[in-house]
């Protein structure tokens, strides 16, 4: 866990710089694409405890960087009177949705085991990694907020 935290620290710093310089949508595009690539790579390449020392910080950098971007973006899309509620809603709704993924992972793993697939957990985790592609699709409807005033009532 600490290894991922080291990576996440640098990932969050990086996305804030990218979001400030190039815009929120390009920063999230890069972050979600990196999440997908790195997560699939790690699940399919991690072979030893030694690999974890460099792969887990990489995974933390990619997967947790988006939270630095959320801290910039979410307050910029809600008017003042709804800002706290809106930000809280965005952060916490996803937690409820994410709760479905561990049982889904185990279900996929069991299905793949029953089909005789080699390394079923890696395959199941790889399939679920494509959830990051949903983030890329969601960017189609995400407004760019860089350089715009905060919304007011």
Region locations from a protein language model:
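Transmembrane-helix signature of 12-pass secondary carriers
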Residues: 1-153
């Amino acid at each position: 866990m600490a290894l991922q935290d080291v990576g996440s620290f640098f990932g969050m710093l990086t996305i804030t710089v990218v979001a400030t310089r190039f815009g929120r949508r390009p920063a999230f595009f890069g972050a979600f694409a990196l999440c997908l690539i790195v997560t699939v790579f790690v699940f399919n390449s991690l072979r030893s405890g030694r690999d974890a020392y460099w792969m887990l910080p990489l995974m933390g950098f990619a997967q947790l960087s988006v939270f630095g971007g959320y801290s910039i973006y979410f307050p910029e899309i809600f008017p003042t009177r709804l800002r706290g509620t809106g930000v809280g809603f965005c952060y916490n709704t996803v937690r409820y949705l994410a709760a479905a993924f561990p049982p889904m992972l185990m279900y996929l793993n069991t299905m793949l085991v029953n089909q005789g697939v080699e390394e079923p957990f890696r395959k199941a985790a790889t399939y679920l990694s494509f959830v990051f592609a949903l983030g890329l699709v969601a960017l189609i409807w995400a407004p760019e907020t860089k350089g715009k005033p905060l919304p007011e009532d």
